[in-house]
């Protein structure tokens, strides 16, 4: 099972680095920062499906 540590999020701004992650909502997030901010916004209901594009 793929996991990402989002304990130091949310962050006010994310860098533009591109390292895609696929969320449990079947949406591709551009990088860990964007994904983790979305996890926080979802109150933890969003999880990582896998690394890479959906």
From Swiss-Prot:
Glycosylated residues, per the record, are: 43
Domain Kazal-like, residue spans: 4-54
Question: Superkingdom of this entry's organism?
Answer: Eukaryota
Record-level GO cellular component terms: extracellular region
A Pfam cross-reference name: Kazal_1
Q: Where in the cell is it found?
A: Secreted
Q: Which UniProt keywords apply?
A: Disulfide bond, Glycoprotein, Protease inhibitor, Repeat, Secreted, Serine protease inhibitor
Signal sequence extent: none
Site described as Reactive bond 3, located at: 16-17
Keyword Ribosomal protein in annotation: no
The record, for InterPro entries, names:
Bifunctional_prot_inhibitor, Kazal_dom, Kazal_dom_sf, Prot_inh_Kazal-m
GO MF terms held by the record: serine-type endopeptidase inhibitor activity
Please give the positions of the paired cysteines in each disulfide bond: 6-36, 14-33, 22-54
Per the record, the domain comment is: Avian ovomucoid consists of three homologous, tandem Kazal family inhibitory domains.
The protein's name: Ovomucoid
Q: Which organism is it from?
A: Cereopsis novaehollandiae
């Amino acid at each position: 099972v793929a996991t990402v540590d989002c304990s130091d999020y949310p962050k006010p701004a994310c860098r533009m680095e591109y390292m895609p992650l696929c969320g449990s909502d079947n949406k591709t997030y551009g990088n860990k920062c964007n994904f983790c901010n979305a996890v926080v916004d979802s109150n933890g209901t969003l999880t990582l499906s896998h690394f890479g594009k959906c």
